């Protein structure tokens, strides 16, 4: 460090070198999360992405509060206070909507910060819930050798002949029911089915009558 307290050129270069490795790892992780963080690609990466998104609200609010308490200037203090209030209101709204969705479905996917739509599919005596990123009036189910995919997401094993006749899409304010309108088999335990919206209302996801034999097979 120079006599006047400023950093020398060599010290700045050394600091950049030290942080360059850390930032390269951080940006690599961000790239992986953004590119593969979709439920149709990798559920593990998607859950990690949701965890990061969930932490951004309190982190943003904490930074804004810190900037408001220790401001650079009066204008920055005012702006930081406004940003902290906006973060708090949006975070509170997120929790309100998530709790409403949880009360409707009983699924922890309700606290997914990326989407407030949940696809509920009754399979084998239970209900499999997945986040639905894109809202649509119809959903396509594809069964390939006894493995079910809907909206590009894996739902586990399901025989084509045992596809449900009705599925639901839950939102904080409404539950949308979709019924099977068309199906076509194309091989052994394989086929395609299309579900289309036919009613909606302010009610909970219907309970599933447990099929003990199928539940044991899926366990």
From Swiss-Prot:
Residues 1-18, 71-78 are virion surface. The chain crosses the membrane at residues 19-39, 50-70, 79-99. Keywords: Glycoprotein, Host Golgi apparatus, Host membrane, Host-virus interaction, Membrane, Transmembrane, Transmembrane helix, Viral envelope protein, Viral immunoevasion, Viral matrix protein, Virion. It comes from the Viruses. It is found in: Virion membrane; Host Golgi apparatus membrane. Residues 40-49, 100-219 are intravirion. InterPro entries: M_CoV (IPR002574), M_MERS-like-CoV (IPR044363). It holds the Pfam family CoV_M. One of its GO terms (cellular component) is host cell Golgi membrane. GO terms for molecular function: structural constituent of virion. It is a multi-pass membrane protein. The keyword Glycoprotein applies. Its main location: virion. Component of the viral envelope that plays a central role in virus morphogenesis and assembly via its interactions with other viral proteins. Belongs to the betacoronaviruses M protein family. Homomultimer. Interacts with envelope E protein in the budding compartment of the host cell, which is located between endoplasmic reticulum and the Golgi complex. Forms a complex with HE and S proteins. Interacts with nucleocapsid N protein. This interaction probably participates in RNA packaging into the virus. This is Membrane protein.
